Amino acid sequence: MTREEARRRINELRDLIRYHNYRYYVLADPEISDAEYDRLLRELKELEERFPEFKSPDSPTEQVGARPLEPTFRPVRHPTRMYSLDNAFTYEEVLAFEERLERALGRKRPFLYTVEHKVDGLSVNLYYEEGVLVFGATRGDGEVGEEVTQNLLTIPTIPRRLKGVPDRLEVRGEVYMPIEAFLRLNEELEERGEKVFKNPRNAAAGSLRQKDPRVTAKRGLRATFYALGLGLEESGLKSQYELLLWLKEKGFPVEHGYEKALGAEGVEEVYRRFLAQRHALPFEADGVVVKLDDLALWRELGYTARAPRFALAYKFPAEEKETRLLDVVFQVGRTGRVTPVGVLEPVFIEGSEVSRVTLHNESYIEELDIRIGDWVLVHKAGGVIPEVLRVLKERRTGEERPIRWPETCPECGHRLVKEGKVHRCPNPLCPAKRFEAIRHYASRKAMDIEGLGEKLIERLLEKGLVRDVADLYHLRKEDLLGLERMGEKSAQNLLRQIEESKHRGLERLLYALGLPGVGEVLARNLARRFGTMDRLLEASLEELLEVEEVGELTARAILETLKDPAFRDLVRRLKEAGVSMESKEEVSDLLSGLTFVLTGELSRPREEVKALLQRLGAKVTDSVSRKTSYLVVGENPGSKLEKARALGVAVLTEEEFWRFLKEKGAPVPA
């Protein structure tokens, strides 16, 4: 490569990487995979090393992240800079890292390291003064981030107050979305025809940057902490391992794995072990972070413009494969929603063959601009669900075909209806809807009918033995014995499981019946609020809106279903069959008609107190108004206390609150 060619390629790479930094760090909507980004950055770094005359302090190799062009939140300067990490992809690069340490420190290796999971989330910085949280911010460009304090405080494990810490303290960590929460969120977004997230990291970033903290609170975010900025010297800590234990002791969640390792060989052993456990983790990890354990050596080594010299990110191999989209088929779910599924040329990803991939909904297809015949880059989102990362448009030949949505249901032939970006089959007798409804009803998280698998459901429907879930409770042993591969013992076991499912409670039943927008959490909230199916069936829109996590669209959809004669008939038949229609949690009318607001820090988790009040029939709201009956005040109350006094609302200290409940005859936690 000539000098001029190198200059042009370096400038091209810098522009490209800056663009992708903005997509990743600011918009939380990357266009390329992590592996592709790493390749671009490595190419730029190698060219800058070969042609040092073109190095520049504003190069992406010398900078961290990206600063928002138009901040959604208030920009805030970090008291001390937040750095990125240099990457290693092979054992040889880890060995080279240790050799650099040996030369820089003038000491013989091996060195002692702490090796930690590299959680794939969003880096944040918490700043405390005299033990009180002042703000929480995203990393941004390392010097200036966005203040997201209120959204961070929706993560219940983040402490607001600390004891026995330096007067000024920065605590650094990662906000992430557990894989289970990510899959659940995407399912809800897909059901509504909205844009889904590509991976848990994007979902975490998008959720943390919501303007409304109540939306953030519903997303199931978690956090794990691993570093100090300001206050590290004053802490008196001697090692990274000790620092992690100190963070735990002070009440910070340290949810990632970590181990000590001696030398590059020891690091490799831990890396291999963590890699093997990767898909058993509740979060996405894209590698390990290797840090010298001795903090005194950190001071000797210092930092480059971009990263510490004493630490390294040792990345897991990227499991991304190129393949072709051969066709698209359409599947019908239990609500009648039609989902496009891509048929791929089979590829092997993370231990299994992938030949199908969900294309979610019309919004997703339009955004990707994906066509039949396209080459695509595929990975497993959350290490579980095959997903298209991007379309390789540069490989198009002109023979690719656009995806056409069917006008009629692929299962029953009924004309589809379109609701926003969602296509649905409205036919209540559609066999696919019946199959999916029964399969969902019997699933482990719903009524948990062990032995009622997909093949058996198909046979029951084919033979006309069941039409819907209520028919399950009228099956007889002789009905089952007439089915292929069904013996006496299997039939008895299945009937016993069906009988046991009658007693799962209203929480599980509401989830099992597939009310629109109702997942496990919302089903539990509805059961807790109303207590019985009869009460729920008579609920008004206003009452549904009082339930935690119910927005107006969901409330209207639930209400429409509750008023549907077919749904009411199904509930009646289930009730006649002996299925429990009551919550397993006791609900009373003891505080019916009263409205509570909670403020400040209580001795028990706020959600627990809120749930208790709701079980006693009270309404719990977030803001004080003239309709508020009582404001319950914990330590460090906010402006709600002043507003309550101005409006003449009754105020209870926490001690008075528990005494009030006892006097009412309510069960009070010990």
Swiss-Prot record:
Q: How does activity depend on temperature?
A: Optimum temperature is 70 degrees Celsius.
| Catalytic activity, reaction form | NAD(+) + (deoxyribonucleotide)n-3'-hydroxyl + 5'-phospho-(deoxyribonucleotide)m = (deoxyribonucleotide)n+m + AMP + beta-nicotinamide D-nucleotide
Gene Ontology CC: cytosol
Q: Which residues form the signal peptide?
A: none
The residues listed in the UniProt record as binding NAD(+), with positions renumbered to this chain, are 34-38, 84-85, 116-119, 139, 174, 226, 291, 315
Pfam families to which the protein is assigned, alphabetical: BRCT, DNA_ligase_aden, DNA_ligase_OB, DNA_ligase_ZBD, HHH_2, HHH_5, Nlig-Ia
Enzyme active site: K118
Q: Which GO terms describe its biological process?
A: DNA repair; DNA replication
GO molecular function terms listed in the Swiss-Prot or TrEMBL record: DNA binding; DNA ligase (NAD+) activity; metal ion binding
The protein's superkingdom reads Bacteria
Concerning NCBIfam families, the annotation shows: dnlj, PRK07956.1
Q: What does this protein do?
A: DNA ligase that catalyzes the formation of phosphodiester linkages between 5'-phosphoryl and 3'-hydroxyl groups in double-stranded DNA using NAD as a coenzyme and as the energy source for the reaction. It is essential for DNA replication and repair of damaged DNA.
Q: What is this protein called?
A: DNA ligase
Organism listed in the record: Thermus filiformis
